[in-house]
Curated annotation (Swiss-Prot):
Function comment: Involved in pyrimidine catabolism. May facilitate the hydrolysis of carbamate, a reaction that can also occur spontaneously.
Pfam families: Abhydrolase_1 (PF00561)
Recorded GO MF terms: hydrolase activity, acting on carbon-nitrogen (but not peptide) bonds, in linear amides
Name the UniProt record assigns to this protein: Putative carbamate hydrolase RutD
Biological source species: Escherichia coli O103:H2 (strain 12009 / EHEC)
Catalytic reaction annotation: carbamate + 2 H(+) = NH4(+) + CO2
Gene that encodes the chain: rutD
């Protein structure tokens, strides 16, 4: 699996791995790269079955497989220890990594994640699946911003959204791959295992997230033994895209604090 690695800003700089959500594209983190690369070696990638890592995914494709293939790619690149920043599905992969490779994951940042899918989130995905079956890739892509962004943010950026729709349609991961990745997301359940995660965790959520209620992050916070929760008042599901200044400040402070906390505990 292909990874994109930034040059380390100094010798032995900590590694931060960015894992996007259901869309799977490493470009999702574009507005975080410049600030992170000043302090960390940053790894981003297109998830298997998407972008520059094309593949046909098995029907039983799982979050555990997503975690294993990423860890194997990191080890092959010479990376043994890394912090994880995961958004939604990416946060699930991050938790799986922390469970399966505890000696490797130093810190976990969960952005609009959850322990198990909430009934509201499941309903949103059911609607989106119906759109996919009835209207194909174009209907899925055109509806996606409604679940990602605040209404006023979208209204002020109509030309940008039209360009993003065209790009997303051109690079659509394919109906079968999308549904198999979505099914992996829906099957994931960390409610009985989260208390085994021992690395420090920062939980970031947005109070106006239409797709994932903030209660999901509260449940995560209660279940994770070494976690802190930060709530952004604005930004929607893709809060790192819509309000990068606020998000980046939380992310940078969280990474620095938790990495220091971990080193002090060793």
């Amino acid at each position: 699996m292909k990874l994109s690695l930034s040059p380390p800003p100094y010798a032995d700089a900590p590694v931060v791995v960015l894992i996007s959500g259901l869309g799977g594209s490493g470009s999702y983190w574009l507005q975080q790269l410049a600030v992170l690369e000043q302090e960390y070696q940053v790894v981003c990638y297109d998830q298997r079955g998407t972008g520059n890592n094309p593949d046909t995914l098995a029907e039983d494709y799982s979050i555990a497989q997503m975690a294993a293939e990423l860890h194997q790619a990191l080890v092959a690149a010479g990376i043994e220890h890394y912090a994880v920043v995961g958004h939604a599905l990416g946060a699930l992969v991050g938790m799986q990594l922390a469970l399966d490779y505890p000696a490797s994951v130093t810190v976990l940042i969960s952005v609009n994640g959850w322990l198990r899918i909430n009934a509201h989130t499941r309903r949103c995905f059911q609607v989106r699946e119906r759109l996919l079956y009835s209207g194909g890739a174009q209907a899925w892509v055109e509806a996606q911003p409604l679940f990602l962004y605040p209404a006023d943010w979208m209204a002020a950026r109509a030309p940008r959204l039209e360009a993003e729709d065209a790009l997303a349609l051109a690079h659509f991961q394919g109906k079968n791959n999308l549904l198999r990745r979505l099914n992996a997301l829906k099957r994931a359940d960390f409610s009985h295992h989260a208390d085994r995660i021992r690395c420090p965790v920062q939980i970031i959520c947005a109070s106006d997230d239409l797709l994932v209620p903030t209660a999901c992050s509260s449940e995560l916070h209660a279940a994770l033994p070494d976690s802190q929760k930060m709530v952004m008042p604005y930004g929607g599901h893709a809060c790192n895209v819509t309000d990068p200044e606020t998000f980046n400040a939380l992310l940078l402070n969280g990474l620095a604090s938790l990495l220091h906390h971990r080193e002090a505990a060793l």
